[in-house]
Amino acid sequence: MGKKKLYILSFLLFWSVAIIAQNDYSVGQFYDQSLTKERKVLSREPVRGDDVIWEAKIWRMIDFRERFNQFFYYPYEKEGIEDRKNLVYTVWDAILNNEITVFEDDEFKIPIDNELIKKRYTKIDTLWLEIEDDEGTVDYQAVIVPKEFSSENIYQLVLKEVWYLDKEISAVSVQILGIAFVMQDLRADEDGEMELRGSVTLFWVPLMSENVKKLLANSFVYRDYNLANMPSWEEIFYTRYFNSFIIREDNIYNRYIKDYYEGTDALKEAERIESALFHFEIDLWEY
């Protein structure tokens, strides 16, 4: 009798543990993913202003259409992608939820009200409905249909970063200060065909903000070769896991490279700046 009670008790205990474990896991998963869902912001050694003896500000462009950078762009659909989000929707949803503040300028001095952001980038379509009354008279009524924000035409990302020499560690380091999404301005011509009218910088996201750091540290990047260990967006930027090209260095005229060079000359200027940054630290120790 005692053994029977012991078996029953063991069975009930096992069953209750199984039920609790099942409730902990998300539907569609076979193991607890809490370790990959809750991450702390990467710790960095603080930099003292007195230790910075040289610095240079650089603006560079990441093009999502480049094969290596396509994980920034996909998935550009917002619905039906499980928990996957591209970088644009990661930031956009945080704006909608009032979790972060974005700025008009790359100096991060002019904050944009989140409600204004929603109105600015939510498009409006006008549909005309044909209404016929009992007497056969036809009238037209306009119906305003809001069109949700879409990342489909956002193909580029601008980074603002600072390169600096820290005498405390005798090394050149780099810190990304902020990012900005660039959207293609597509409009219909007279024949109804969409044509590119230019590009628009949407807003600047301050990567030094604690709220933004927390957001990026807990938002994951989909890479199809290892779903069990997906990096966070914070890790992507920290390890500089992207291809990019320089579009501006800090200068007294506040000009971009495209303002004074075109074509191959612009490419050569970008390469010259990149090379100067790369060799700066090496040249310091040459005698």
Give the ranges of each region predicted by the language model:
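Extracytoplasmic
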Residues: 152-154, 174-176, 200
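Short secondary-structure subsegments characteristic of cysteine-rich extracellular domains
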Residues: 195-212
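Extended serine/threonine-enriched, polar tracts that run as long, contiguous segments within proteins
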Residues: 171, 176-194
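Bacterial Sec-dependent N-terminal signal peptides
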Residues: 1-27
